[in-house]
Amino acid sequence: MTYHPKSDFLRVMQERGYLADCTDKQALDEALSKGVVPAYIGYDATAASLHVGHLLNIMMLRWLQKTGHKPITLMGGGTTKVGDPSFRSEERPLLTPDKIDENIEGMRKVFARYLSYGEGATDALMLNNAEWLDHLNYLDFLRDIGRHFSVNRMLSFESVKSRLDREQSLSFLEFNYMILQAYDFLELFRRYGCRLQMGGSDQWGNIVNGIDLTRRVLEGEIFGLTSPLLTTSDGRKMGKSAGGAVWLNGEMLAPYDFWQFWRNTTDADVGRFLKLYTELPVEECDRLGALQGSEINAAKILLANEVTTLLHGRDAAEAAEATARAVFEEGGVGGALEVVELPATTLGEGLSVAHFLVAAGLVASGKEAKRLVAESGLRFNNEPVGDANAPVTAATVGEELKVSIGRKKHKLVRLS
């Protein structure tokens, strides 16, 4: 039997497809209906930017704020030093404190695009769990917190069990991660009255640990809510493309390439992605997702424009669309294509096409470049390139050279 939420937030989560599991849906709905509920999602600082795989949870925080509640973005300055073992086949490399701080700064820029931070009742908070984790006394922590955890139960969580079943090592350092994340929820409840933790469904075990700990220590009524682990209709994990991670920071992925990622959405995913990654009405998302044939291309452009506008602004989205039109329909260049600067000294008196592509960072290897040429997948200034050993000189590049790899990847190369 379908539950019909009273609260705007839970209704949005259910209608738009964000909701996978909830520890107590009716009690949470009641709390959300009565007043402001602070809720958090934790982010370990393992990279200099978040990627598209994080975007679904960021949109959940955005909807939380839009429906009158308080989002908390918790930076894992402390837990990143340990590393989350959930569903990983090997231990994460350890990062230096300086690198962790640098990564947090990169993530901060992304959150500022989606959430309004400040001191008001529903303004977002950005916190760092290093604030309380860095100063823990180990013996006190074991006595006061560790005694509430059952190792038997921790070993039963699928995220850990799957690793042990494959006879892969799980360090004591990583095993502690679950306790530290649970402690985060306790501290957030104690300090900020935070009553809800959200995350991907792979975090269910960690979230439940935090709820159990907080109830035992502080007798708090708190909740957990998870989103589905999203894949595309053809089974690919969200956040990845053929060219690698789809980063949210403009310095790591040009707005045009971000726009193009969404424009290339498969037909079967359009309606679902419109509901999850834009703020268009659900009925409109369903209508657009049901379009067939060439008509659905307009819906894909709308999807790309809406998602890019949220992250990079309306001007960047319009520039990306104009560039795509110039590149694909008119064979031109457009103003938003990413520019690759190649030192003139690297080019020297000339490189082969294969070596030129590698030097410019457009392919990973000479072998890949040769395969690209052999499959007629390379063009310079819209002209097919048929010889991977042909010379590329300064005269070839000129003021700038438009390099097209396949039908959808286009860059401008300039000599510096």
Swiss-Prot record:
Q: Does the keyword Nucleotide-binding apply?
A: yes
As for subcellular location, the record says: Cytoplasm
- Which Gene Ontology terms of cellular component type are present? cytosol
The reply on keyword Ligase is yes
Q: What is its main location?
A: cytoplasm
> Which enzyme type, at the first EC level?
ligase
Gene Ontology terms describing biological process: tyrosyl-tRNA aminoacylation
Functional description taken from the UniProt entry? Catalyzes the attachment of tyrosine to tRNA(Tyr) in a two-step reaction: tyrosine is first activated by ATP to form Tyr-AMP and then transferred to the acceptor end of tRNA(Tyr).
Name the UniProt record assigns to this protein: Tyrosine--tRNA ligase
Organism source for this protein? Answer: Cereibacter sphaeroides (strain KD131 / KCTC 12085) (Rhodobacter sphaeroides)
This protein's gene is called tyrS
